[in-house]
């Protein structure tokens, strides 16, 4: 099939961009390296839009949470990623989490069935010299293409590190020591009856021993060329967090507040005391057979992981479907090398989208892919792109990536209200809701005036 646009990379951003283009009548060639005999060291399958790190799209609260607002805005623009996420949704309290396999399969099925999309399993080693192109190769860009990008952008480095959390088989968890509950008993329509997290409590003595085990455990060594590569805080390995101080984890992923331990009750606390520390597991698939260890991204060696994690109450006989790991991410200094439409300065036929632009997170990656698809469709139609207002989550994210961030200190960024034009006149308690109310109103006006789709 001849094509109007070539998309390189079939992750979240590339898949979303392909969908947005195809539903506007644009012919798309979607090149994905996996399935051609090539594989990254972090992916497990050759499925489109595979989720490598967590299975969570984070908060789905569109009234007081920035990523929840981004969910809302993407749904308003018929996002394939959000549509597939709803098909694959699993219970996760007030968050949105998905069954990885169901999600990837839904995205792939939808794209392969679309007459305007041709999915081609091939590795692309260099940036095309001509033709409208969207590069959405993500954090695991092949070395040859990364070198081509470095040459085209004049950058010295494109990389930082992410860590992956372990996944445990549900039937290997000893529920006589754990209980199911969401923090503060928060629920959503997708929630399980009792709650959405398995909680493994720790006493002070157990926590201190576990903390020391994280410090002492044997860790993956970096190769020489990797040693100066920084971490992104959003996927900070738990042992790195532990090294920051003995209390750091107790105020982070292992905090016990809002969780009532039914095995530690008293007259004063009939529902149970809050544990000194806790390890939480979140459902990872629709069947409920796999649960991931929340916040437990790690670069401990496999043997050290098994030994240490089996000291956690309830996980003494844990069987791991996947152990934690470390992978290298790739991103551009986008404020320096991209224009306001995500085009590479000096080679404007090429757009970048997704995590390679320096946005961080599944939803953010897909959102940038969505906008790249819309921009490219507008360009093909000979129309002028008027981007979403900066007061929206989409507009705030795009503005940050394409020029509002400081180029000298640019780092991967999740969507957050700090990227929005401030509302200083609104009291702090009402400010988050004011941001989302303003965004929804402005998005509605933008869609009415700018978004014309013949799907």
Curated annotation (Swiss-Prot):
GO terms for cellular component: cytosol. FAD binds at residues 9-14. It is found in: Cytoplasm. PROSITE patterns: GIDA_2 (PS01281). Its cofactor is FAD. Belongs to the MnmG family. TrmFO subfamily. This is Methylenetetrahydrofolate--tRNA-(uracil-5-)-methyltransferase TrmFO. It comes from Erythrobacter litoralis (strain HTCC2594). The gene is trmFO.
């Amino acid at each position: 099939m001849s094509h109007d646009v070539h998309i390189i990379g079939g992750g979240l951003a590339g898949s979303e961009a392909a969908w947005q283009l195809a539903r506007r009548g644009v012919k798309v060639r979607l090149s994905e390296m996996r399935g051609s005999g090539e594989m990254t060291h972090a992916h497990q399958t050759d499925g489109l839009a595979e989720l490598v790190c967590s299975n969570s799209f984070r908060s789905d609260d569109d009234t007081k949470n920035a990523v929840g607002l981004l969910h809302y805005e993407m749904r308003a623009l018929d996002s394939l990623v959000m549509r597939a996420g709803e098909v694959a949704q699993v219970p996760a309290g007030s968050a949105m989490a998905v069954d990885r396999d169901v999600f990837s399969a839904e995205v792939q099925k939808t794209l392969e069935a679309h007459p305007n999309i041709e999915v081609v399993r091939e590795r692309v080693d260099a940036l095309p010299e001509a033709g409208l192109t969207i590069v959405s190769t993500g954090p695991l860009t092949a070395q040859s293409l990364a070198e081509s990008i470095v040459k085209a952008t004049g950058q010295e480095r494109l990389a930082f590190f992410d860590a992956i959390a372990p996944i445990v088989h549900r039937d290997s968890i000893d529920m006589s020591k754990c209980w199911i509950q969401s923090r503060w008993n928060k629920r959503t329509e997708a929630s399980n009856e009792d709650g959405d997290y398995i909680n493994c409590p720790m006493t002070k003595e157990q926590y201190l021993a576990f903390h020391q085990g994280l410090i002492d455990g044997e860790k993956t060594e970096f190769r020489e060329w990797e040693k100066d590569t920084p971490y992104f805080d959003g996927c900070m390995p738990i042992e790195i967090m532990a090294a920051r101080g003995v209390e750091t984890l107790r105020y982070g992923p292992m905090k016990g507040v809002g969780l009532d331990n039914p095995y530690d009750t008293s007259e004063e606390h009939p529902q149970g005391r809050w544990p000194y520390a806790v390890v939480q597991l979140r459902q990872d698939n629709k069947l409920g057979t796999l649960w991931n260890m929340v916040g437990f991204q790690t670069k401990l060696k496999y043997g050290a992981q098994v030994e240490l994690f089996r000291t956690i109450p309830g996980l003494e006989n844990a069987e791991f479907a996947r152990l934690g790991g470390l992978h290298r991410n790739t991103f551009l200094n986008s404020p320096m090398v991209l224009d306001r439409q995500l085009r590479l300065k000096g080679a404007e036929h090429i757009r970048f989208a997704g995590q390679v632009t320096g946005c961080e997170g599944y939803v953010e990656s897909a959102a940038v892919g969505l906008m790249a698809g819309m921009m490219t469709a507008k360009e093909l139609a000979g129309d002028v792109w008027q981007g979403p207002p900066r007061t929206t989550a989409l507009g705030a994210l795009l503005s940050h990536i394409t020029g509002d961030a400081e180029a000298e200190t640019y780092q991967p960024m999740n969507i957050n209200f700090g990227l929005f034009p401030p509302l200083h006149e609104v009291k702090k308690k009402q400010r988050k809701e004011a941001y989302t109310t303003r965004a929804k109103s402005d998005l509605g006006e933008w869609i009415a005036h700018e978004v014309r789709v013949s799907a």
